UniProtKB/Swiss-Prot annotation:
Residue ranges, compositional bias (Low complexity): 430-448
A GO molecular-function annotation: DNA binding
InterPro entries according to UniProt: DUF7699, SAP_dom, Znf_CCCH, Znf_CCCH_sf
Protein name: Zinc finger CCCH domain-containing protein 62
Keywords assigned: DNA-binding, Metal-binding, Zinc, Zinc-finger
Positions with biased composition (Basic and acidic residues): 298-325
Keyword Transmembrane helix: no
Ranges of compositional bias, category Acidic residues: 18-54
Length: 702
């Protein structure tokens, strides 16, 4: 019998209790106190002493997303779509809310142990005796925790809270009867009002979306005091925190329970309030509430507007970035298809300068002769730009020597007879081209300068030959009386322009110190007739056996400017009586002061005459040309020395000081620079010279 009894006890122990079965059945569904389930968020919150006192207070547990439909300050359009909000909140249904609601099923109190039962009995006894101050702090908090009340504050606050809870529990409906709620405050409730309102409780399946309503299971009437009201920062929804004074109906709330409810749910059913002792104070509280609501709505409007502006700026920025990227892609593609080759003007000019001049003139490009530098010299640039000016006043002479070029000193042209010098220049250039072969493939700039008289025909009316008196028979007979210097010149010193194709300024021949045979007068005359000199604007120097030279004298009258005239202010011509002071090579230069007649007029070395016959018209042209070419050059006393004269012509525009050149120092280095005086061809041929003592050539032929 004992064994079956034990088996029955084990079987009963294995079976679940009926109370547990009921709890499991009830746990399959959850209850919602009203048609809006969001007010359930405040249910089941356990206030413990470890919580922050400020956060645990009823004023700090309001929902920031609460609102009101009936409140004048409530904006219904700002509430949003309730169905969408319900769907989103349904996904959070299985969080802490479900576990908290399990502890409050119906009106059952939580299970208490022996200590809790002893504490409740002790509190009831002390309350009945009026000795509630004997409770300790931890005992006060234990009592409040059992009734889910706030635990913040000191002992006095805790004792006051316990007295109020006991009073409300026993005398709540007596102290706050339904008949005392006489004023309708639907849509206009504020902090401090004592209100009564109803709630509908719906039941739905656990885990179902919150937007889906369940079936109605009951109603509940609540009476409480509004201890806090606020506007949410996100949606400006009005939220109330109500301390329950009494509750009856389906699953009533315990006394002094803090209930969080939205304004629209509070104002959904009829809401009534008790009158205040001072209604003016309520009006002030109501105005302060409306002001906060106005500021909250304005802040929300500004925030929405800023958010819209930011969205538009973001869209515009994206469009601009997209357009810029498209433009960059188009530029890159265009550059890839059509590359741009930038060629500067200098590059084109350099390429043009590198063209071989021989190809332009039909000559072979592989000529063994040396070519001039492709870079333009200052002379070439001047010759290139001179035709652009209507009245050229400077002429450059280029002397070629083994691939080098030099610009002669520019001289001021006398504008009285410019056609004479151009005519002589053209004839001289033509003779040089016929007698000597081209030295360089590149044409000499002297050929370009010969075209100037053709470009300026207005000067041709000045091309008139000056009349000259023919010499007498005695003067013609004196031509046959030549000296050893004339014979030495005619036999051994050919014109440098024919031998080397250049002038004395750029080329000099080696001078032999041995005596030369004396030619006959017939040979001298025949030589001058067969080979007249064809050089112009050039100075030739030849060594004499004795090494003597005669200084030059002025050959023009600066005041009258009579060039080649037969009328002279000085005495008549006397042959072989030219007053000139010889200067020995290597001397200290003490005699050059006597050799100089006119110190103010600078006379460069004159070239030989074009022809030895007085009938030739070019002879007169040559004389006039020398006057125009050398007439206006000035030279100071310190600049001119007859031993340095040819060096001044050689260097052109380069200045020389007293220490640059000395006869003794440079004699071994370049002995060709010292030139003796040349015999006067006119005097040898005609026996008299129109220049007289002013002639720069030597008349002493003995």
């Amino acid at each position: 019998m004992a064994a079956p009894a034990a088996d029955d006890d084990d079987h009963r122990a294995a079976l679940p209790r009926e109370e547990d079965d009921g709890e499991e059945e009830e746990g399959s569904e959850e209850e919602v106190e009203s048609d809006d389930e969001e007010e359930e968020e405040g249910e089941g919150y356990d206030w413990s002493e470890e919580d922050d006192p400020e956060a645990a207070s009823l004023a700090g547990i309001c929902d920031p997303d609460a609102g009101s439909y009936d409140d004048p300050t409530f904006d219904p359009a700002a509430d949003g779509d309730l169905e969408v909000d319900a769907v989103l909140r349904s996904r959070m249904a299985r969080m802490s809310l479900s576990s908290a609601r399990k502890d409050r099923k119906g009106s059952r109190m939580p299970k208490m142990g022996k200590e809790e039962m002893d504490l409740l009995a002790m509190v009831d006894k002390l309350m009945h005796d009026g000795q509630l101050e004997k409770l300790k702090v931890y005992e006060c908090k234990a009592y409040l925790r059992m009734h889910k009340l706030r635990l913040s504050g000191n002992k006095e606050v805790l004792l006051t809270r316990i007295r109020g809870q006991i009073e409300v529990k026993t005398m709540g409906e007596v102290k706050y009867p339904v008949s005392s709620f006489v004023l309708n405050c639907q849509g206009d409730s504020c902090k401090g009002d004592v209100v009564v309102f109803e709630q509908n409780i719906y039941k739905r399946k656990k885990g179902a979306p919150r937007g889906v309503k369940g079936h109605l299971c009951g109603q509940r009437t609540n009476a409480g005091r509004i201890i806090k009201e606020s506007y949410g920062t996100k949606k400006q929804q009005h939220t109330f925190t109500i301390e329950i004074l009494w509750s009856r109906g389906y699953k009533p709330w315990p006394p002094l329970h803090p209930l969080l409810i939205k304004g629209r749910n509070l104002y959904k059913d009829k809401t009534m309030r008790q009158p205040w002792l001072d209604e003016e104070e309520r009006n002030r509280a109501l105005q302060e509430k409306h002001a906060r609501g106005y500021v909250a709505r304005k802040t929300r409007e500004v925030r929405i507007k800023d958010k819209e502006n930011e969205r538009m700026r973001r869209l515009n920025r994206n469009k601009e970035n997209k357009s810029k990227g498209q433009d960059n892609m188009n530029k890159k593609s265009s550059q890839a298809v059509f590359p741009q080759h930038t060629v500067t003007t200098n590059t084109v000019q350099k390429r043009a300068e590198k063209i071989i001049p021989s190809l332009q003139h039909g000559e072979s490009g592989n000529s063994s002769q040396q070519h001039l530098s492709s870079k333009q010299t200052p002379t070439e640039q001047l010759l290139h730009y001179l035709p652009q000016f209507p009245h050229p006043q400077q002429h450059n002479e280029v002397l070629l020597q083994k691939g080098t070029s030099r610009t002669s000193t520019t001289q001021l042209i006398n504008h009285q007879a410019p056609s004479l010098q151009h005519a002589v220049k053209v004839e001289t250039t033509q003779q040089q081209q016929q007698q000597q072969p081209p030295k360089s493939i590149k044409p000499a700039p002297i050929q370009q300068s010969s075209a100037y008289p053709q470009q300026y025909p207005k000067h041709q009316h000045h091309n008139q030959a000056l009349p000259r008196v023919p010499p007498s028979q005695e003067q013609r007979a004196a031509v046959s009386q030549t000296s050893a210097a004339r014979q030495d010149f005619t036999n051994h010193q050919a014109p440098p322009s024919r031998q080397h194709g250049g002038s004395e300024n750029m080329r000099r021949q080696e001078i032999s110190s041995r005596p030369t045979p004396t030619p006959t007068p017939q040979q001298a005359v025949s030589y001058t007739q067969q080979q007249p000199p064809n050089h112009q604007y050039r100075n030739e120097a030849f060594w004499q056996q004795g090494g003597t030279s005669t200084s030059r004298t002025g050959f023009m009258d600066r005041q009258s400017n009579n060039w080649g005239s037969t009328d002279h202010d000085k005495p008549a011509f006397q042959p072989f009586t030219q007053k000139a002071k010889t200067y020995q090579h290597g001397s200290n230069g003490s005699g050059h002061h006597q050799a100089r007649v006119d110190r103010e007029t600078h006379q460069p070395l004159r070239s030989r005459n074009q022809d030895y016959h007085w009938e030739d018209q070019s002879y007169h042209h040559q004389q006039n040309h020398h006057q125009n070419y050398y007439g206006h050059r000035q030279m100071s006393q310190d600049q001119y020395h007859h031993q340095q004269n040819h060096h001044q012509n050689y260097h052109g525009r380069q200045g020389m000081n007293g220490n640059q050149y000395h006869d003794r120092q440079n004699h071994n280095q370049n002995p060709q620079r010292f030139r003796p005086w040349k015999p006067c061809f006119i005097y040898q041929q005609q026996g008299w010279c129109p220049y007289g003592e002013n002639c720069k050539f030597m008349h002493d032929l003995r």
